[in-house]
Amino acid sequence: MHNELQQKLAVLHKLLQDNKADAILIGSDQNRFWLTGFPSSAGWLVVHKQRVNLFIDGRYFEAAKTAIDPLVKVELFTTYKQVKALCEQVGVKHLLIEGDYLTFNYQNFIKELCAQYTVINAQEIRRQKLPSEILAIEKVVEITRKVAVKLKRFIQPGMTELFIAQWITDQLVKAGGAKNSFDPIVATGKNGANPHHKPSKLKVKSGDFVTCDFGTIYNGYCSDITRTFLVGKKPNNEVLLKAYKKVDEANMAGINAANTQLTGAEVDKVCRDIIEASEFKDYFVHSTGHGVGLDIHEMPNVSTSYNKLLCENAVITIEPGIYIPSVGGIRIEDMVLVKDHKSVWLSAKIPRAF
């Protein structure tokens, strides 16, 4: 823990140096947990050149003092004036704040602390996962795999989307997950044409393709997997069978392409080019993927607009899809650990339709 904390502080100190800033104020639950390893629903971290201060209220104070590395000075939070006094004491003239977690109250608080502040994308600091984070993600993917194996056999004609979604939720917890990382998506038949369909009372029929997008949380870290399963042995729509094969091809190409030599946009293009060269060119309507970690969607993105190189040990999804209005849809989503040349396919053992 101590070594990882020092590595994380090195990331933050470089951010301070690059932005010519004196301190970073962290108010989000995710980044507070990322730095300290201590889960809490409130608190303020001030990372400055001398040390790290955590201001946390009475619900967590005693536990935090015991659990958190001594490099972090834990203080009982009673008033915002404590944070302001610290900033004045260490000479904070330029403050970095988390733009992606910015609330109205947070912004008003910032104005009182420091006249000059810079909004940063705080998720960027978590792009490169450390060994303990990778272990947690591997574990949460394994929990998800266990449920997916059962799910493929479980889905039967006559079941509703809602029933299947609730079953997934229950099974993820039984398998060791803390809770859903997001509400499961279950879409059968024509409902599959809506990428973020909300499960309904529509019943599955034999020959349907059923898209199931689900994940859970382990030690704070999320999984995000999609499988489109065939119910029965023969599809009732040959167009969707062709679409499945094309999505599968694009998905595998993206998994094989992901590495530190490519940008998120370039990996997106690998998948997108395969679908756009087919009869389904008009039906891939979202980005290829995104980062996964303490947030279900975080940096880096695998999209047409993400022109940064993927960094080693980033965890991303590869999730191309085809969505044909009034017909149905196919999506296959996997999680990948980015490496220099050959990335690690984390979800390789999660079953597919064929």
Curated annotation (Swiss-Prot):
<dbReference type="Pfam" id="PF01321">
    <property type="entry name" value="Creatinase_N"/>
</dbReference>
<keyword id="KW-0464">Manganese</keyword>
<feature type="binding site">
    <location>
        <position position="213"/>
    </location>
    <ligand>
        <name>Mn(2+) 2</name>
    </ligand>
</feature>
<feature type="binding site">
    <location>
        <position position="319"/>
    </location>
    <ligand>
        <name>Mn(2+) 1</name>
    </ligand>
</feature>
<feature type="binding site">
    <location>
        <position position="290"/>
    </location>
    <ligand>
        <name>Mn(2+) 1</name>
    </ligand>
</feature>
<dbReference type="InterPro" id="IPR000994">
    <property type="entry name" value="Pept_M24"/>
</dbReference>
<dbReference type="GO" id="GO:0008237">
    <property type="term" value="F:metallopeptidase activity"/>
</dbReference>
<protein>
    <recommendedName>
        <fullName>Putative Xaa-Pro aminopeptidase</fullName>
        <ecNumber>3.4.11.9</ecNumber>
    </recommendedName>
</protein>
<dbReference type="InterPro" id="IPR000587">
    <property type="entry name" value="Creatinase_N"/>
</dbReference>
<keyword id="KW-0482">Metalloprotease</keyword>
<dbReference type="InterPro" id="IPR036005">
    <property type="entry name" value="Creatinase/aminopeptidase-like"/>
</dbReference>
<dbReference type="InterPro" id="IPR050659">
    <property type="entry name" value="Peptidase_M24B"/>
</dbReference>
<feature type="binding site">
    <location>
        <position position="224"/>
    </location>
    <ligand>
        <name>Mn(2+) 2</name>
    </ligand>
</feature>
<keyword id="KW-0378">Hydrolase</keyword>
<feature type="binding site">
    <location>
        <position position="224"/>
    </location>
    <ligand>
        <name>Mn(2+) 1</name>
    </ligand>
</feature>
<dbReference type="Pfam" id="PF00557">
    <property type="entry name" value="Peptidase_M24"/>
</dbReference>
<keyword id="KW-0645">Protease</keyword>
<dbReference type="InterPro" id="IPR029149">
    <property type="entry name" value="Creatin/AminoP/Spt16_N"/>
</dbReference>
<feature type="binding site">
    <location>
        <position position="333"/>
    </location>
    <ligand>
        <name>Mn(2+) 2</name>
    </ligand>
</feature>
<keyword id="KW-0479">Metal-binding</keyword>
<comment type="similarity">
    <text>Belongs to the peptidase M24B family.</text>
</comment>
<dbReference type="InterPro" id="IPR001131">
    <property type="entry name" value="Peptidase_M24B_aminopep-P_CS"/>
</dbReference>
<feature type="binding site">
    <location>
        <position position="333"/>
    </location>
    <ligand>
        <name>Mn(2+) 1</name>
    </ligand>
</feature>
<keyword id="KW-0031">Aminopeptidase</keyword>
<dbReference type="GO" id="GO:0004177">
    <property type="term" value="F:aminopeptidase activity"/>
</dbReference>
<dbReference type="GO" id="GO:0006508">
    <property type="term" value="P:proteolysis"/>
</dbReference>
<dbReference type="GO" id="GO:0046872">
    <property type="term" value="F:metal ion binding"/>
</dbReference>
